[in-house]
């Protein structure tokens, strides 16, 4: 295993979420730190929802240099930050906490990561529709990234419409009502959608550890 020898000067970064034991982030970051001779260690903390505020304050008090945030805390963690990047504020979710004076600043790199993935795959979304499954923090970021990339329309499918409507309102508030068409449906409406040549993005926690074999779409789904 490629990992630094920890000393009294080693800087610590971490991932917070629930669950976190399946994450590959420690392996990735610790290996990079070793190869670049960066005196940094990366670990994970499984944090319950009710303990989130205490966890953020405690991490700052303990000198944690920065943290990544995963489900289910990407939205709720925002109320415990001293500063938030403007685009992350508009998205309504953060996945990165940067140590600043007095606390942590929130940012969202999901937008950049998703946009880069589309570019590397050679997929041009301009003028096309997209169907988003789920309406959590990742879905919010992806919707903003799609608008930035020139998507024509977005269809958000979620179990309940409340979070989907929140995303639509956030998009309209930031970009204006004429920038993109955003439609909101529950999963029961999926088979009634009449769209072709669209981008499908699965953002729910279905298929995550420990239920890796689960799939949100049935094998014979018409979607």
Q: What are the functions of these language-model segments?
A:
Residues 180-223:
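Rossmann-like adenosine-cofactor binding region
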Residues 120-124, 221-223:
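Glycine-rich helix-loop-beta junction characteristic of Rossmann-like nucleotide cofactor-binding loops
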Residues 17, 108, 126-151, 158-159:
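Glycine-rich adenosine-cofactor-binding loop
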Residues 12, 41, 129, 152-154:
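Residues at the starts of beta-strands that form the adenosine-phosphate
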Residues 65, 152, 198-199:
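Conserved acidic residues
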Residues 151-175:
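NAD(P)-binding Rossmann-fold cofactor-contacting core
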Residues 6-121:
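Phosphate/diphosphate ligand-binding glycine-rich loop within oxidoreductases
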């Amino acid at each position: 295993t490629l990992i630094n020898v920890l000393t009294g000067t080693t800087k610590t970064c971490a991932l917070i979420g629930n669950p976190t034991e399946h994450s590959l982030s420690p392996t990735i970051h610790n290996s990079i730190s070793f190869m670049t001779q960066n005196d940094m260690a990366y670990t994970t903390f499984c944090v319950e929802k009710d303990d989130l505020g205490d966890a953020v304050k405690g991490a700052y008090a303990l000198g944690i240099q920065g943290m990544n945030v995963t489900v289910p805390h990407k939205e709720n963690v925002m109320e415990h930050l001293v500063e938030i990047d403007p685009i992350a504020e508009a998205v309504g979710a953060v996945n990165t906490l940067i140590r600043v004076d007095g606390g942590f600043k929130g940012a969202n790199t999901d937008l950049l990561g998703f946009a880069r993935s589309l570019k590397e795959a050679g997929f041009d979304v301009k003028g096309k529709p997209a169907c988003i499954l789920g309406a959590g923090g990742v879905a919010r970021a992806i919707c903003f990234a799609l608008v930035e990339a020139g998507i024509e329309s977005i269809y958000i499918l979620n179990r309940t419409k409340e979070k989907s409507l929140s995303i639509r309102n956030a998009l309209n508030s930031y970009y204006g009502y004429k920038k993109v068409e955003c439609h909101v449906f529950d999963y029961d409406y999926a088979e009634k959608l009449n769209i072709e040549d669209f981008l499908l993005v699965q953002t729910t926690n279905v298929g995550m550890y420990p239920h890796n074999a689960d799939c949100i779409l049935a094998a014979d789904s018409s979607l």
